């Protein structure tokens, strides 16, 4: 909880920064605060079963890894003896636990129940963080006190915590909130701003805790934060604690005309401060001793010292264990290895690029400009090449391929980061793009080169088809001409036979045959049109026309003759050979003569 209403008092000092503000920083994280915050998001059974809080913790870590943040997780240790009454009072309110009547000693801390649900959540967070190369520092008592000590000793740049009493333990920069995703940000409070804008130093904040109430004291009932701040400022930051330790909280008294003293409503033996006496002597030695204990708990908390082996080990850097992380994510979230790699590997690659950029900037500061890929270079550039330009949430980025990073082919990184780390890669990419613009596209090349060949091949093919068509038509015309000549010869021979038999004695027999055929009613289909023994009398008048049925064979023969004539005419018009045209002309004249002779 921290100090009551202290965040409201510090509201004018609130600042919001984008997530990039955290890049290349070393931060301490109050692990209990983060897990309480993430667990409050959804307390349903499904959320607990699917470990939604642990997923949120994992995504926060990977976001900080991408920004090249060195993370130090700090967990709570034992409960301070001065905080035990407050802790039990909270448990009673939550679980309705009856008071056992045992008064704990003020100097004895209370070990936490390591088998509780929240302790199991902390263990899971430690496991998943260890696979990412992040170790957890187990505090002796309060985690925020340990974070504040590391920050005050400049072993970290800032602390993540929403317990406002972290400033009372000596923290300089505190991030209260963090938001990921689009437009991600952090909410920051700095002790320098608190001193400048509010006139409140660390001693003044401890005095406010005594007046307003905290985990270690109940404060003064009915005293508002505005009035408390005015009282503390009026005394001054340098002497406020001495005054409170020697005189108590008498400066916060509200005198009345009545001389009747009001007894404290809370027993002082339970480790918490009694309410301030409205009128009367407030220098009770027992109460003054309790005030001194609260001041000492804030000024000298039980923590690992900055030069201890425990702190040195927590500050050491460890590499993340890819295989172990895949196993843990499959156990906790049922993720396949590919999904775990998709989440973490791009962030690790971006962290490596930021470290390389820092190395480049340091070498530039000391005027040691080492060329890339040379033996003198301590590290190799992690970027293999730039693939294409991208824009993510309105920010210019590059999609790049990586060197020596198994499981990751390419990912997207900010363009300004690539420019700081390896500007020569950008130059190479621009030259490559300029060369592509000068040269025609591969598809256009294929079209331009293939169109002449296609057109030439089409011309050749059309010529071949025309040649074949001419050959076929010439062959057809020649065959049809030969057939027509044979038929004409047969008709001429028949014609001469018919003319020779005009005056023969069989004429009467022929007429009788016609009359008999008409009398019997036999159609033309039952007899051939021009039998060999039949004689046509061209001098005598033709017999009367009668309706006769025409056989199908005669119709087919007639249509066939018509087709032959058509073919002959078409072939005549399409032939270019002079000899062929001459023969065709002679054939037409011959056929015309035959038609005239038949008509006559």
UniProtKB/Swiss-Prot annotation:
EC identifiers of the protein: 3.1.-.-
Compartments reported by the entry: Nucleus
Classification lineage: Eukaryota, Viridiplantae, Streptophyta, Embryophyta, Tracheophyta
Cited Gene3D superfamilies: 2.40.50.40, 5' to 3' exonuclease, C-terminal subdomain, 5'-nuclease
Region (Disordered): 433-458
GO biological-process terms attached to the record: DNA repair; telomere maintenance; UV protection
Record: residues binding Mg(2+) 2: 163, 165, 215
Cofactor: Mg(2+)
Keyword match ATP-binding: no
Organism of derivation: Arabidopsis thaliana
Keyword terms, alphabetized: DNA damage, DNA repair, Endonuclease, Hydrolase, Magnesium, Metal-binding, Nuclease, Nucleus
Chain intervals with Basic residues compositional bias: 435-444
Chain positions covered by the region annotation 5'-3' exonuclease domain: 215-353
Record's function text: Endonuclease which cleaves flap structures at the junction between single-stranded DNA and double-stranded DNA with a specific cleavage site in the 5' overhang strand exactly one nucleotide 3' of the branch point. Structure- and sequence-specific nuclease that resolves holliday junctions (HJs) by symmetrically oriented incisions in two opposing strands near the junction point, thus leading to ligatable products; HJs are physical links between homologous DNA molecules that arise as central intermediary structures during homologous recombination and repair in meiotic and somatic cells.
Entry's cofactor comment: Binds 2 magnesium ions per subunit. They probably participate in the reaction catalyzed by the enzyme. May bind an additional third magnesium ion after substrate binding.
Region (I-domain): 130-218, 130-219
Family of this protein: Belongs to the XPG/RAD2 endonuclease family. GEN subfamily.
Gene Ontology cellular-component terms listed: nucleus
Region feature XPG-N domain, mapped onto this chain: 2-97
Protein's UniProt name: Single-strand DNA endonuclease 1
GO molecular function: 5'-flap endonuclease activity; crossover junction DNA endonuclease activity; metal ion binding
Location of region: N-domain: 1-97
Binding site for Mg(2+) 1: 30, 76, 142, 144
């Amino acid at each position: 909880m921290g100090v009551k209403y202290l965040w409201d008092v510090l509201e004018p000092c609130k600042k919001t920064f984008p997530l990039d503000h955290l890049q290349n920083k070393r931060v301490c994280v109050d692990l209990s605060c983060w897990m309480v915050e993430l667990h409050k998001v959804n307390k349903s059974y499904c959320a607990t079963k699917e470990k939604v809080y642990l997923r949120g913790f994992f995504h926060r870590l990977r976001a900080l890894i991408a920004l090249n943040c060195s993370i130090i997780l700090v967990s709570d240790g034992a409960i301070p003896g001065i905080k035990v009454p407050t802790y039990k009072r909270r448990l009673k309110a939550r679980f309705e636990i009856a008071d056992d009547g045992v008064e704990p000693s003020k100097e004895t801390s209370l070990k936490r129940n390591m088998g509780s649900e929240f302790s199991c959540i902390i263990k899971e967070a430690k496991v998943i963080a260890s696979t990412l190369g992040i170790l957890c520092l187990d505090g002796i008592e309060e985690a925020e006190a340990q974070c504040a000590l590391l920050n005050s000793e400049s072993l970290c740049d800032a602390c993540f915590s929403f317990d406002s009493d972290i400033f009372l333990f000596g923290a300089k920069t505190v991030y209260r909130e963090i938001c990921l995703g689009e437009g991600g940000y952090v909410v920051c409070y700095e002790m320098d701003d608190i001193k400048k804008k509010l006139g409140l130093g660390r001693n003044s904040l401890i005095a406010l805790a005594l007046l307003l109430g905290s985990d270690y004291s109940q404060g003064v009932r009915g005293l508002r934060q505005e009035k408390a701040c005015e009282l503390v400022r009026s005394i001054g930051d340098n002497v406020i604690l001495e005054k409170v330790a020697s005189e108590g909280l008498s400066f916060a008294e509200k005198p009345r005309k009545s001389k009747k003293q009001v007894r404290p409503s809370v027993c002082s033996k339970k480790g918490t401060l009694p309410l301030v006496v409205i009128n009367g002597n407030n220098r009770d030695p027992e109460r003054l001793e309790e005030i001194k204990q609260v001041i000492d708990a804030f000024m000298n908390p039980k923590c690992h010292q900055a030069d201890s082996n425990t702190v040195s080990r927590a500050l050491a850097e460890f590499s993340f264990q890819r295989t172990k992380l895949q196993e843990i994510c499959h156990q906790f979230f049922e993720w396949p290895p590919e999904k775990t790699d998709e989440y973490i590997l791009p962030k690790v690659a971006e962290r490596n690029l930021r470290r390389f950029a820092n190395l480049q900037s340091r070498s530039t500061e000391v005027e040691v400009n080492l060329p890339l890929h040379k033996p003198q270079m301590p590290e190799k550039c992690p970027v293999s090449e730039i693939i294409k330009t991208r824009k993510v949430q309105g920010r210019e980025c590059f999609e790049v391929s990586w060197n020596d990073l198994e499981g990751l082919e390419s990912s997207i990184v900010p363009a300004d980061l690539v420019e700081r780390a390896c500007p020569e890669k950008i130059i190479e990419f621009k030259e490559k793009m300029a060369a592509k613009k000068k040269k025609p596209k591969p598809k256009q090349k294929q079209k331009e080169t293939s169109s002449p060949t296609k057109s030439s091949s089409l011309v050749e093919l059309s010529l071949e088809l025309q040649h074949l068509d001419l050959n076929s038509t010439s062959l057809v015309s020649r065959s049809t001409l030969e057939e027509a000549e044979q038929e004409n010869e047969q008709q001429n021979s028949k014609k001469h036979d018919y003319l020779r038999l005009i005056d023969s004695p069989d004429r009467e027999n022929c007429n009788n045959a016609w009359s008999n055929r008409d009398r019997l009613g036999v159609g033309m289909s039952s007899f051939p049109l021009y039998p060999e023994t039949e004689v046509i009398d061209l001098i005598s008048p033709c017999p009367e026309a009668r309706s006769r049925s025409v056989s199908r064979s005669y119709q087919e023969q007639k249509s066939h003759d018509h087709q032959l004539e058509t073919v002959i005419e078409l072939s005549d018009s399409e032939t270019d050979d002079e000899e062929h045209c001459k023969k065709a002309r002679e054939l037409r004249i011959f056929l015309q003569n035959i038609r005239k002779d038949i008509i006559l």
